[in-house]
Amino acid sequence: MLKKDMNIADFDPQLFQAIQDETRRQEEHIELIASENYTSPRVLEAQGSQLTNKYAEGYPGKRYYGGCEHVDIAEELAISRAKELFGATYANVQPHSGSQANAAVFMALLEGGDTVLGMSLAHGGHLTHGSHVSFSGKLYNSVQYGIDETTGKIDYAEVERLAVEHKPKMIIAGFSAYSGIIDWGKFREIADKVGAYLFVDMAHVAGLIAAGIYPNPLPHAHVVTTTTHKTLAGPRGGLILSAIDDEAIYKKLNSAVFPGGQGGPLMHVIAAKAVAFKEALEPEFTAYQEQVVVNAQAMAKTFIERGYDVVSGGTDNHLFLLDLISKDITGKDADAALGLANITVNKNSVPNDPRSPFVTSGLRIGSPAITRRGFKEAQAVELTNWMCDVLDDITNEGTIERVKNQVLELCAKFPVYG
């Protein structure tokens, strides 16, 4: 018999300790991985609810199981809030991840072997935008565009040239490591010129878009996907949106999610998405996103002042790439040294990187998590100077230890969950 006082600590102390250690790590380390964030206790409450017990294959009002009247409400709330948040006429909140949302779009709009045009992973794209190691590059004919080596920005002339040459059935706009603002309208012009669908993956900037401080792709794209974590600060999951008022495409998308790619949806996660969307509709969410950009720009500026190269010379969003080629430091070594100082980043390839993706010559740095715990511009600048101190001499154990102690003091002043 199940009892409410059952707990992990008593039953599984090894797992409980791992959870406690991870909680401590999050509190005592500064998180600069651009795709990570801290979700609210309200989201955690919904995700840990009894809704995890309910199977609900299908969609609200059209389930294959009985007893779905309450989870239907949760999903309908998530759908309506997602539509309101992004100005959509269609929303599917069931994808378990951003990659599965992207896979559903491919399944709905393409046939195997169709040509797709997406951003190269080496230039800031995502695995699911046509990389040869992903389904998107294995099952479809993938053509890749990149950024201008001089400006660090998307080369729209190249995108158009490739589109005219290869006649893709779908063009993908979006990124996992690009610090500029994308001209969605220009992408749509190119797509219309060659008769292609425009598919936007806004996973990294969804929170900025929801707050109105980054251009919304919904008026331009046929289909838009996103994750629900990252800048949106919700649970880990995916979302598909559209505003083209095309019921035929909506039905194809729904069928591609279920039964095409998934079975039963995760109702506890969908409930958590509903909470996160409601949070994103609050005024303070806009203030948070504005600070995210301010902090990222302050960090990029400080790195440049300290003699480091930033791809494209700065950032217009929440992330930027630190190019370490001129410093003869690998991304792998920089990642490790900063990790010893309780600063978590991720090694990342930079444009025309001479090193392998397992070593790299750069770091991807993002500000959503530090801003979530309350950092303002002053703390962002202070932190960046500490990082430069470490990177200036990555084998100096004394410097690493000093910075680690400074990080611990700063984290104590700005707890994740105060």
Curated annotation (Swiss-Prot):
Keyword annotations of the record: Amino-acid biosynthesis, Cytoplasm, One-carbon metabolism, Pyridoxal phosphate, Transferase
Entry keyword Transferase: yes
UniProt-annotated location(s): Cytoplasm
Annotated residues for binding of (6S)-5,6,7,8-tetrahydrofolate: L121, G125, H126, L127, S356, P357, F358
Location of N6-(pyridoxal phosphate)lysine modifications: K230
Catalytic activity: (6R)-5,10-methylene-5,6,7,8-tetrahydrofolate + glycine + H2O = (6S)-5,6,7,8-tetrahydrofolate + L-serine
HAMAP family: SHMT
CDD domains: SHMT (cd00378)
GO biological process, one term: glycine biosynthetic process from serine
Record-linked InterPro entries: PyrdxlP-dep_Trfase, PyrdxlP-dep_Trfase_major, PyrdxlP-dep_Trfase_small, Ser_HO-MeTrfase, Ser_HO-MeTrfase-like, Ser_HO-MeTrfase_PLP_BS, SHMT-like_dom
Subunit-structure text: Homodimer.
Functional description taken from the UniProt entry: Catalyzes the reversible interconversion of serine and glycine with tetrahydrofolate (THF) serving as the one-carbon carrier. This reaction serves as the major source of one-carbon groups required for the biosynthesis of purines, thymidylate, methionine, and other important biomolecules. Also exhibits THF-independent aldolase activity toward beta-hydroxyamino acids, producing glycine and aldehydes, via a retro-aldol mechanism.
GO MF annotation, one: pyridoxal phosphate binding
Disulfide bonds, paired cysteine numbers: none
Requisite cofactors: pyridoxal 5'-phosphate
Cited NCBIfam families: PRK00011.1 (NF000586)
A cellular component annotation (GO) from this entry: cytosol
The name this protein goes by in its record: Serine hydroxymethyltransferase
